[in-house]
């Protein structure tokens, strides 16, 4: 769009801000002012950010498109993940800051949860997009109260009805990020989409397959999930206890890793159809993790590499 170009001042401002972010690994206008020896005032930098009519989403898409073209990228793997960025407990104005469980201490902290999509190719790895996840406060209160009433033995018909959610859940956000990439680059070949255990479910798988019909989706399931072997239900962990794992060497982030693995194509109850399920543990680990893949034609070694 020829009418969406940046002005000279906007280009200078953007160049300085991006350089400051890379050097400081933060976004702090006061710190940027100090870096420029107070040549650029923090309120001036912030003012440009607030007043400039810049389509940030299009700028991100254009940047990705430029890298894809410059490196002649034709195919790659999409990675989905999320991270909690801890904030001060007194924060009030940061978007989507909410209470989260702190895995390190077992307590709670205030954080922003950021969902992000990354493209991994044979040449480069680049970020494609991100979105903030924010839980629905009203729905969380309902769930808390509903659990109390359920524990007290009150039947469902006598408990308050579940309210409609006003925010997207993580699975909807993740599918939205994938869909946006497909809309921007429809001819780019996606070999597979990888996501962690949180996205190991039918809702996420079906949502992605509406965007990329036959793409391989690699994720994880919990050890207590039910699968069927010869028509009989059994938990994943119990099933794989019956089989001795096979030692293999796989490529993990460019390095060779010794692993113990065993895979089989079995029906997973929560999905309603067969998946390639692979029990995998790295050298030094005691417990298996259970990797899943939707495309049954792949080899187990290719799925985990």
Can you name each region flagged by the protein language model?
Residues 14-18, 114:
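Short, amphipathic alpha-helical segments that act as regulatory/interfacial helices
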Residues 5-10, 20, 24-91, 96-97, ...:
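Electropositive nucleic-acid engagement tracts
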Residues 1-9, 13-15, 36, 63, ...:
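Single, function-defining residue in the core of a domain
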């Amino acid at each position: 769009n020829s009418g969406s170009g940046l002005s000279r001042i906007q280009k200078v401002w953007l160049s300085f801000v991006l350089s400051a972010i890379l050097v400081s690994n933060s976004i702090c206008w006061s710190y940027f002012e100090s870096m420029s020896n107070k040549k650029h005032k923090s309120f001036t930098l912030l003012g440009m950010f607030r007043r400039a009519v810049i389509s940030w989403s299009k700028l991100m898409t254009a940047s990705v498109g430029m890298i894809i073209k410059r490196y002649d990228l034709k195919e790659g793997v999409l990675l989905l993940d999320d991270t909690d960025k801890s904030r001060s407990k007194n924060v009030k104005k940061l978007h989507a800051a909410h209470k989260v469980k702190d895995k390190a201490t077992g307590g709670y902290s205030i954080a922003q949860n950021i969902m992000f999509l990354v493209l991994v190719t044979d040449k480069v790895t680049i970020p494609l997009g991100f979105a903030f996840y924010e839980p629905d406060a009203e729905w969380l209160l309902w769930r808390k109260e509903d659990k109390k009433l359920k524990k007290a033995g009150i039947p469902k018909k006598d408990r308050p009805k579940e309210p409609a959610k006003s925010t997207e859940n993580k699975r909807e956000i993740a599918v939205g990020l994938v869909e946006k990439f497909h809309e921007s680059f429809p001819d780019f070949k996606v070999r597979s989409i990888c996501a962690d255990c949180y996205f190991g479910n039918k809702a996420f798988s079906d949502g992605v397959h509406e965007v990329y019909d036959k793409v391989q989706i690699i994720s994880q399931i919990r050890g207590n999930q039910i699968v069927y072997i010869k028509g009989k239900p059994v938990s994943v962990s119990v099933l794989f206890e019956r089989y001795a794992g096979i030692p293999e060497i796989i490529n993990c982030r460019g390095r060779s890793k010794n692993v113990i693995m065993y895979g089989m194509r079995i029906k997973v109850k929560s999905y309603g159809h067969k998946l390639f399920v692979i029990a995998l543990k790295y050298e030094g680990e005691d417990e298996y993790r259970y990797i899943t893949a939707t495309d049954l034609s792949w080899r187990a070694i290719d799925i985990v590499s």
